[in-house]
Amino acid sequence: KPKRAAGPRVSRRTFALGAVGAAVVMGLGGVRYLPSRTLLRPPGGQDEEQLVRGCLHCEKCREVCPKHAIAPAHLEDGILNARTPRMDFKSGWCDFCENEPGGPKCVAACPTHALVCTDPASVIIGKAVLNRDWCLAAKGMGCHECVDVCNYDALELGADNVPVVNVGACNGCGACEWACISLSAGSISAGATDRAIVIRPTEEVEA
């Protein structure tokens, strides 16, 4: 039987920080105190309990992400979520390291297997949601940046030339959110507080 490949080595300082974090978690009664806010996780982090229990906050997953799409969660995301990895589609998107041998680099870099991904093609990070009130295409500007970058046939232009999301085909890669230029349109998108198309947790979209 082949041996399981060893993960990256963890420094004493990182291990100590992780141990302190784990102690806090257990002192608070564990994952039942997870906040209600759901975060978008990297590939292999969709098992929330496994991720929170195993994450050492070492940020190795963030460091190796070739698309710069991973960021540490903040305290306002919840005390147990703080410094765990979340997706940041304002900075990049996830291609699941499709051209990298061995699958997602974030998964390979995780020293505790808090991220586990055996089949990247089956991973659903989230689902795209379009706000027509902020969409440049809906304002007659002819924008279709999000449609152009989608590699999964999850976006198409509707009869009115406004993007339509095929929720079933969307895996939440975030390319559409990263490419959206609505917030840079000045007065055209006045009042907008986010990009016109964003990725939301699956349960929020399909509820």
Annotate the PLM regions.
Residues K1-A207:
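Non-ligating segments of multi-cofactor redox enzymes
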